[in-house]
Each structure stands twice: as C-alpha cells, then as structure tokens.
Regions:
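Short, His- and charge-rich active-site/binding loops that engage polyanionic ligands
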Residues: 49-110
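N-terminal module-boundary/linker segments of secreted carbohydrate-active enzymes
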Residues: 20-64
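Sec-dependent N-terminal signal peptides
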Residues: 6-11
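Domain-level detector of nuclease and nuclease-like folds
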Residues: 92-275
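Positively charged n-region of N-terminal signal peptides that target proteins for export
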Residues: 1-4
Length: 275
C-alpha cells in the first residue's frame, strides 16, 4: 500500500490557457493537510497527489481520472459568489493527462469531483475547479440529477448547521470498465463520504454508474452505504476521527433548500442559485 503523502508530486511551470487564466503550480502535498485533517488516504494503485488551494487530488495517471478528491467546506465557502465559468482545461502539471476533447461526442459529462458550487468563493479557485484532473466521465442524468442534489445538500448542511465538513469524493473503477477518448476510464460507480468536523458524525453514499440514470426521486437515503463497504469497494483506505460516529442507515442531516437559496441570494444577489 502506498501512502498518498509519500508519493512524489509534480510541479508545472506557470501556463496561460486559452481561457485567459493562469494555472498555478501545485502546492506541496503537506499543504493539503487542511483537506485531509484526519490523515491522507492510502491506495494500492500508483497514485499521484496534486495539491490545490481548495482540494487534494489523488490522480491515477493510468486511468486518467482522479481516484479520489478530498476537500474541506466551511459555511462561508458554501456561499461563494463567483459565477460559473465552465473553463474546462487540461492540467498542465500532468504530462499526457486528460483533455476536454477526450469527452467530446461520448455522451458523458465532464463531472466534477470537487464541485464548482463548493469552490466559487475565489476566482482562481473557481477556475481550478475546472482542471481536467478534477473530472471523471459521468452520465448527465446522474451528474445533473441526484449527484447534484447531494452536492447541494452538503452546502446546505454547512450553512444551516454553521459547521465545517471534510469531504471525500471518489471513483469506483477497475479492469473491464469502458474507456473514452485517449485512455480515460469511465468508472462504474461513484461515492461520497462526508465528515462533520464539529460533531465527528460520518455519512457515506455510493451510486452505480448507469445511463440513463433511473429517476429515483430525491431520496438520498436510498444510496447510503457504510463507509467500510465504500472503502472495500473503492480499494481506498481513509482516516476518520478517533471518536467518529457513523450515522445510522437511512439517516441524514436535514436540509432546507429554500433557506439555502435565500442565504445565497442575500450574500450574492437576487439571481443567485444555491446549486
């Protein structure tokens, strides 16, 4: 098993993209401890860590997707006001990495692991949310459906509880999975683990990746999965608070989407949306 912390990072020269924003060098991996406060994940795969200001990527160069992305979400950051740019661009710190054209004509969305809505609190951070090393191929009916609902729910929990969260978002993939573009693996599942940093409560969800995605309504509890099972399925080992309390199956923190929208509009303007 290889510890992400010990893997070698790759630095890139400053590069200006066609979207007229300048890519910054990745930070030292140790700087991303804020996004992995309980410890870095451990994987048997050959993983390259990429530390950004707002998130940590465990990038799998062989699959050209992130194995997992970790980040912290605070109440103020959950109400960011930077408009979405859709500035998808290759990560210049990765040689031979994924590019937007790998997804062209495939029917798959360029699906964020660390979502733009959680990273809209700073202009440069919002741009960095669109680096292709933060993307996986996702069916639009999942990416824009119940997956998006979970992303919005996490922001609601942060704002309404006035508490910070540590979030792990990852791909479930392996031999035999579909490949698009020039070697980009399409995961057969995705997961999200959320830790409340104040209460040490933990909850996990896992989603099979099928297209079109069935309409199962807005009940996220149908996708709850014990974190031990997620780790076994995804072949990744995470660290958790020593006194962590996993929420019972079928239980989640309540969220008021109307109140979240009102809070966003109060901060960002009348046309702002929570999602």
């Amino acid at each position: 098993m290889k510890k992400l912390l010990l893997a070698a990072g790759v630095l890139a020269a400053t590069v200006t993209t066609s979207f007229a924003w300048t890519q910054r060098q990745p930070l030292p991996v140790a700087a991303c401890q804020v996004h992995a406060p309980y410890g870095f994940p451990v994987s048997a795969r050959a993983i390259q860590p990429i530390c950004r200001q707002a998130y940590l990527v465990a990038y799998d160069a062989a699959a050209k997707i992130p194995e997992v992305v970790m980040y912290s979400l605070t109440p103020p950051n959950a109400l960011g006001c930077v408009p979405r740019t859709n500035a998808f661009v290759a990560d210049q710190s990765i040689q031979g990495g994924p590019v937007p054209d790998d997804y062209a004509g495939t029917g798959y969305d360029k699906g964020h692991m660390s979502p733009d809505g959680d990273l809209s609190w700073d202009v440069q951070v919002e741009f960095e949310s669109f680096l292709m090393t933060n993307m996986t191929p996702q069916a639009g009916s999942l990416n824009r459906g119940i997956w998006k609902l979970l992303e919005t729910s996490v922001r609601g929990w942060a704002v309404q509880r006035n508490q910070s969260f540590t979030i792990m978002v990852g791909s479930i993939y392996g031999p035999g999975d579909k490949v698009i573009g020039k070697g980009v693996v399409v995961p057969h599942g995705f997961y999200k683990i959320v830790i409340n940093n104040q209460t040490n409560e933990i909850a996990g969800w896992a989603f099979p990746h099928v297209a079109p995605y069935p309409n199962l309504g807005n009940d996220l509890t149908k996708f709850r999965m014990p974190v031990a099972q997620i780790q076994q399925t995804a072949a990744v080992k995470f660290a958790f608070p020593a006194n962590g309390i996993e929420l019972a199956p079928g239980k989640e923190w309540p969220v008021d989407f109307g109140a979240l929208t009102n809070a966003k509009r109060a901060k960002c303007g009348a046309n702002a949306e929570a999602n």
